[in-house]
Regions:
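Primarily extracellular Gram-negative trimeric autotransporter adhesin
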Residues: 24, 163, 177-183, 221-225, ...
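Parallel beta-helix/beta-solenoid
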Residues: 11-14, 42-47, 51, 82, ...
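Extracellular beta-strand/loop-rich repeat segments of large surface/secreted proteins
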Residues: 334-436
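Residue-level detector of buried hydrophobic side-chain packing
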Residues: 254, 339, 413-415, 525, ...
Length: 778
């Protein structure tokens, strides 16, 4: 269909299906093949669908072409069909150039379709001595050489451009010329004019021997009709996914190039949203983002740039600049492949408004005369990769090294004030001590500060095993931050010891006051718990609730013997994680009450505690489970001294030993933990002062004790690979406990009792501890 001057209106649901076949032999076939050609007028291609399907085996070079839609008008045209499918296939080995959408002239093309699919292919393998006149050819999905092309925000533009050639000629190996070998392929090419792709753009192109470019912006083109042309070119893309591959030729995900002419032109590309750009080759050169000449390319969103060469003869660059300007301003960028900055180029990372993180999975080389600018930006250098920069500028900048070999970082002229050079968590974990890591980092870098403004600091990130630290330029440690996840584990380790220590209970808490009972058999049950905290580098809040039931038998007027079973459920919370634990224990006790008022209480205990813990650090998640078997013995003595028929004083002393058998386990971050056996030996001196109700109805009292743990060390070893650390937490020391209690005897055989208390001392605190029980004497 041909639309000329004066034409206007809307054409809905237009379908073109053309198969043009010609003689198999011949020097040239000048026929041009267009699905839709708009040379004038103003039309709208609308409806639900627009479909153009062209297939030809015509031969020809130069301007001979097969084009789905050609717009060369100076007017305004539009495509509004909901779905657009454009397919063009050239199957001749001396085939024509192939285009999906060709936009020239000074007019404007607006596309508001939901989906635009462009599929192009060519079988051209043209020898250098081709008999075809003006024998160049190319394949371009969307070609803009003048005017403007604008897509709507809802438009998804999908472009696939493929070479059907089975092999490349010798003339085309590694070359980018379109006059021999397989046709070069391009997804989107701006060689003049403006493109505003406000929706999403997905491009997939591949060539055999020719070059392949997913998106290309340039100021120059040549054809046999117009000759050499130099133009301003500018494009914006909202969201881009681009893949370019060539078997033996050059592959560029994004190519911005400049050819010097009689006038100065501008070449600008801006990607607003996220961009995922890939370039692949077997033996050619792959450049994910290539910026050459007086060109400017800017990415406002996150960028992933990947370049790969599958053979040793190939080379790959995630970024390649030669006299151009490239800016990556996204918060998270990933560069898979080497970075090469040449000939007065500038690479800028970040824009100062937010922290920009760039993962560099390749070597970065910035030659003399070039500049790397970091504005509130950090480069994270992969292990085994190096950075060699001539001039570094910016502010709030950092470089993180994941391997500390000599020569990893070289900056010839650092103009950044306070450049942070950091050993990553994984690199820091390779050293048993912070001083060793600091020394290795200082030897791995060679940073020369500008006399005017440059300076740098070195530090290490806290890893799965290592502490964080800072050091001077010579590697001398100036400050240290303990490993938060290991610190939490160590302190919670100690809380396990506290939990078992707290299972020691005074006789009045367990049984109430049974001194005056003459019943032979007793049964009792109680619930108890506490809310505690431990603050040493990290803060832990621990709550536990238990239920205990037991029974006893009075041997004679003095002695009774009994046993008990208890279950405990505990929960720990801390700023960087949480833990859950539960435990079971069995206890046997022997209690004696003497006529003089004295009493003794002996308890033996055995238990089992299980713990699940999760702790987070900047580097990793420490997650593990472990089990501890526990043993305990305690002895309490006291004297019940009646002041009169109502009031009494009861001094008390107690010694309790606890043993927690250590466990070994491996956390989710591969840190191996080997616990030592923990021990506690608590001495307690205290008293209670109370008043008894008339007729044996019960008692109320207040009590206070001074407690001291003579042991209380929780030691363990943490290891990662061949590196290990011996760590320890001391939960011993002195604390004071105090509270109130009461017992109510509702009958001769049934009584209820309870206590409420607090504890304070050193890093360990108890906001409250409660115990409520009942007993029945038969």
């Amino acid at each position: 269909m041909d639309v000329k001057d004066g034409a206007s209106g809307t054409l809905n649901d237009f379908i073109v299906d053309i198969k043009a076949l010609g003689p198999k032999n011949g020097k040239n076939q000048d026929q041009q093949l267009f699905g839709i050609e708009v040379t004038g007028g103003s039309i709208v291609l609308g409806g639900d669908k627009l479909k153009v399907d062209l297939e030809t085996d015509f031969i020809g070079g130069g301007n001979n072409q097969a084009t789905a839609i050609d717009f060369s008008t100076s007017g305004s045209t539009a495509i509004s069909a909901k779905q657009v499918d454009l397919t063009v296939a050239s199957k001749a080995q001396n085939g024509k150039s192939v285009y999906g959408i060709a936009k020239s002239g000074n007019g404007t093309l607006k596309i508001t379709s939901d989906v635009v699919n462009v599929n192009l292919s060519s079988a051209t393998v043209r020898p250098a001595n081709s008999e075809v006149n003006n024998d160049y050819s190319e394949i371009i999905g969307v070609d803009i050489s003048g005017g403007s092309l604008i897509t709507a925000e809802n438009t998804a533009l999908n472009i696939k451009v493929h070479s059907l050639a089975t092999a490349a000629t010798v003339d085309s190996l590694g070359g980018s010329s379109n006059k021999a070998g397989t046709s070069p392929v391009t997804g989107i090419k701006l060689e003049g004019g403006q493109g505003a792709f406000n929706g999403t753009v997905t491009v997939d192109v591949n060539a055999v021997g020719g070059s392949a470019s997913a998106v290309e912006v340039t100021n120059y083109f040549y054809n046999t009709t117009l000759g050499q042309n130099y133009n301003d070119s500018a494009a914006t893309v909202n969201k881009l996914q681009a893949t370019a591959s060539s078997k033996t030729g050059a592959a560029s995900g994004i190519l911005a190039s400049y050819t010097k002419g009689s006038e100065v032109n501008s070449v600008i590309l801006k990607v607003i949203g996220e961009a995922d750009v890939t370039a692949e080759t077997e033996s050619g050169t792959a450049k994910a983002i290539a910026v050459t000449g007086q060109t400017t390319v800017e990415f406002d969103g996150n960028v992933t740039a990947t370049a790969a060469a599958s053979e040793s003869a190939g080379t790959a660059y995630s970024i390649y600049t030669d006299a151009g300007t490239l800016s990556l301003q996204g918060a998270n960028n990933t560069l898979n492949g080497d970075v090469s900055i040449k000939n007065a180029s500038t690479l800028s990372l970040g824009n100062g408004s937010h922290v920009s993180q760039t993962a560099l999975n390749g070597n970065l080389t910035a030659d003399s005369g070039t500049t790397i600018e970091l504005q509130n930006a950090v480069i994270d250098v992969a292990a085994g990769k190096t950075v060699n920069v001539a001039t570094l500028t910016g502010s709030d900048a950092g470089i993180v090294l994941n391997q500390l070999d000599e020569g990893t970082l070289t900056v010839s002229d650092n103009k950044v004030k306070g450049l942070a050079v950091v050993a990553s968590a994984s690199a820091n974990d390779l050293y048993a001590d912070a001083s060793e890591a600091a020394e290795a980092l200082s030897k791995s870098i060679a940073v020369t500060n500008s006399s005017a403004s440059g300076s740098y600091t070195i530090s290490g990130q806290s890893g799965a095993l290592s502490d964080g630290w800072t050091a001077d330029e010579k590697g001398n440690i100036t400050s240290r931050t303990t490993n938060q996840s290991l610190d939490v584990f160590g302190n919670y380790n100690a809380m396990t010891l506290v939990q078992w220590r707290n299972e020691v209970n005074h006789i009045s808490q367990r049984l109430g006051d049974v001194r005056d009972s003459s019943a032979t058999i007793g049964a009792w049950a109680r619930v108890y718990g506490y809310d505690s905290s431990y603050d040493d580098n990290v803060s832990i809040d621990f709550k536990a609730n238990s239920i205990q039931a037991g029974g006893d038998y009075r041997i004679n007027n003095t002695w009774l013997v009994g046993g008990a079973f208890s279950y405990t459920d505990g929960e720990g919370k801390f700023t960087n994680g949480s833990a859950d634990s539960d435990g079971y224990s069995l206890a046997a006790y022997l209690s004696g009450f003497f006529d003089c008022g004295a009493y003794v209480d002996f308890v033996g205990r055995i238990g089992r505690f299980s713990t699940d813990i999760t702790a987070y650090s900047d580097a990793s998640e420490f997650k593990g489970s472990y089990n501890n078997t526990t043993f305990g013995l305690s002895a309490e003595v006291g004297y019940h001294w009646k002041l009169n028929d109502t009031f009494y004083v009861e001094p008390q002393a107690e010694l309790a030993y606890g043993f927690v058998k250590g466990d070994d386990f491996t956390g989710a971050n591969d840190v191996r933990v080997e616990q030592d056996d923990f021990q506690t030996l608590v001495g307690r001196l205290g008293a209670r002062i109370g008043a008894s109700f008339a007729d044996g109805a019960g008692t109320v009292y207040a009590h206070a004790s001074v407690n001291h743990d003579f042991l209380g060390d929780a030691d363990y070893t943490a290891s990662l690979g061949s590196v290990s650390r011996d760590l320890s937490v001391d939960i011993g020391g002195t604390w004071v406990s105090y509270g109130i209690g009461a017992q109510f005897n509702t009958s001769k055989n049934l009584n209820f009792y309870g206590t409420l208390e607090r504890a304070n001392g050193s890093e360990y605190q108890e906001d409250y501890r409660y115990s409520v029980g009942m007993s029945y004497r038969f």
